[in-house]
Amino acid sequence: MGSGYQLLQLPRERFRKTSFLVWVIILFQRAISMPLGIVTNSTLKATEIDQLVCRDKLSSTSQLKSVGLNLEGNGIATDVPSATKRWGFRSGVPPKVVSYEAGEWAENCYNLEIKKSDGSECLPLPPDGVRGFPRCRYVHKVQGTGPCPGDLAFHKNGAFFLYDRLASTVIYRGTTFTEGVVAFLILSEPKKHFWKATPAHEPVNTTDDSTSYYMTLTLSYEMSNFGGKESNTLFKVDNHTYVQLDRPHTPQFLVQLNETLRRNNRLSNSTGRLTWTLDPKIEPDVGEWAFWETKKNFSQQLHGENLHFQILSTHTNNSSDQSPAGTVQGKISYHPPTNNSELVPTDSPPVVSVLTAGRTEEMSTQGLTNGETITGFTANPMTTTIAPSPTMTSEVDNNVPSEQPNNTASIEDSPPSASNETIDHSEMNPIQGSNNSAQSPQTKTTPAPTASPMTQDPQETANSSKLGTSPGSAAEPSQPGFTINTVSKVADSLSPTRKQKRSVRQNTANKCNPDLHYWTAVDEGAAVGLAWIPYFGPAAEGIYIEGVMHNQNGLICGLRQLANETTQALQLFLRATTELRTYSLLNRKAIDFLLQRWGGTCRILGPSCCIEPHDWTKNITDEINQIKHDFIDNPLPDHGDDLNLWTGWRQWIPAGIGIIGVIIAIIALLCICKILC
């Protein structure tokens, strides 16, 4: 008995070594096969796992935010006649509405109020909770009539109509919307702010304050035959003055045309309607496609001094063209100026351009003010003219002989030629203004001297006709002297009329804007490039996430190309590709939910759970293989006894394997010690 006990008893020193080895094995095995179900925040934090496993790659489905992307970035025509052709009426198709979390700033939005011929409404009222799109640079408000062959207005390409964080497949009456799709956008890991309260009001457009960061400009239209094959669209300048729109144009063109008509007093002052038509030579694409800050940045301007206004006819009764009674038809023609911008230096006084515009001796301002004629014009230098100004333009008259005398005549001695002056002053009476004294700040001026190769600008002639004078009379001159007028107007043309905060970008082939601008319910600190995105989830009301969006040049173009491809794949709702992507995200969320008790997918799979989006220009992500788990201590919610039984014993499988391994190791060590001893 004693000998057997001595055989089982280990030497003291050897027992210490063996015990130390056993404990090392146990601790090592414990660290390797730790029961993942009892991992707490005291071991590893989620941020540490992100840094160790995923680094800067996509780490969780919580980083995917649904964002409304506008279709205008794809280069589609945004003018009202072109946009309405993309919308059509259908019957028997129920509308569908989906929500999104953040929206992109829109350059063009639309607001429709269309009636049928019997006076009934074409479009339905918006449901409760549907509000207008809150970030629009231009709102095109269209009123009119149409056949409306159907119950609801859908998008022919299958796109959505984006409202305030709601995307619908139909158009609602009197509610501002923009065209777009809903896509998933990857955001950086945000910061949670628990102290921020839910905003009491949603963001709204600011249309009155010109200094507002979100200034919105509303353009009004009248449309007939809406929803038909051939529709007629009129741009509304005021209640009695309209412009016929017959080709694609930019909203900036309409803004400048409106300013030109008002500045030149080309508005109807009677109860009749004055409708202007545009000459084919007028280029309506004067604006630059770009996002906006306070006001629009322009790459080029509509020069009102090159526009000629001519009254064509007056209708007193309804005719074959369905013109209403008292309608005055006018035409806006375009006379391009000679390209002479290099003669107007930007770093010197504007008078220099006058002194270098084909004169052989210095021009005296005092002589012009006193009504004296100017000599010293030469024949050859007149091929180059003064840079265009809002008052005078210069052209070469081919009918004039090549040799001209050096003396010049004033306006009363050389009236404008009929070939260059198209305005009939006897027909301008229907649009004459009653108060013309405010048209020009000068009250007493002198006529401008001209040479025979130079023609008078129609604006100057029109202004003289408004004051009751003609080009052949000099009793009451209406314009200042040549030098005074040109210097002041050139100075005005050189000074920018619009505040530009960003450098002007040239139009690109696909018209992609590299800047991302997003709006959400939280608007404070609305800096360019920042996205304030509300977080909506279980027990998360009042919590807002601040995500930082960097303005990456290739990102927005890629997203818009994706939006365009997605749009073609939609049929009034998301088609198979988008549905499969949604199902994949739901599956990954379900996996994350099931595995969160054991540390999450990244904890189990390691780096194999991480992926990085491969091609931003084709799609946002090809697949999602990585989910980050936020370590929690709370057990899974009760969903039944079977689920509790499963989660109750399944989570101890790794721990049981570890314990069995330790027992086997101890028995093996005892056996080895027994054999050796």
UniProtKB/Swiss-Prot annotation:
Other known facts: Filoviruses entry requires functional lipid rafts at the host cell surface. Essential for infectivity, as it is the sole viral protein expressed at the virion surface.
Residues the UniProt record annotates as site (Involved in receptor recognition and/or post-binding events): 58, 64, 89, 96, 171
Any one GO biological process: entry receptor-mediated virion attachment to host cell
Topology, Extracellular side: 34-651
Name of this protein: Envelope glycoprotein
Transmembrane segments: 652-672
Sequence segments annotated as region (Fusion peptide): 525-540
Classification lineage: Viruses, Riboviria, Orthornavirae, Negarnaviricota, Haploviricotina
Site feature: Cleavage: 502-503, 638-639
Biased amino acid composition, Polar residues: 315-326, 370-421, 429-472
Region listing for Disordered, in residue ranges: 315-349, 370-482, 489-508
Coiled coil: 555-596, 616-635
